[in-house]
Amino acid sequence: VEVIMAMAILVAGGAGILALQQATTEGNLEAREMTTATTIARTWVERLKRDTVLWTTGGAGVPSADLTRTLYLLAVPAAGTTSTWTTPVPPDLAVESYAFDYFGNDTLPTAAGVTYCAQDRLQWVSPGRTIRADVRVWWPRNSRVGGNARFPNCGVGSETAIGNSNSVRSVT
């Protein structure tokens, strides 16, 4: 009887240890996903900063905010209008993209293995002088099963639905 009791305690303890290990593994996986998404967001912030080099302002014969040479800032809505989330589409998706694989590398939006997607929200703070840029990176809650099947092509055209969805995680 004592041996059976000892074995029952051992089995219960072993099951507890396995449950803790599973919880730790899941926590580490989620932390890794958050870190990758944060790194992607930083990458997009740097791309927007790079784009500001092409922004000219003021001077003789130049409109107050000439964004025509920029790649991404050109999408800023008119001053006083509501800003919404959009997907920044680079001119050459083979060079840089709004879609990323599990490791945070740029990839084509239609490629297999797309895990993370980037979006931005641009808004005038001081019209013609200062733009606020928010960057959101999102990925499916269970990226190991099914990937981005619910929002193909990184959800281009579904930005509002993605923001309201319980099936994705995001960092801003």
Q: Which sequence ranges carry the predicted segments?
A:
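Low-complexity, Gly/Pro-rich coil/beta segments used as flexible assembly/activation regions
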Residues: 35-172
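Aliphatic-rich helix starts adjacent to a transmembrane/signal segment
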Residues: 1-42
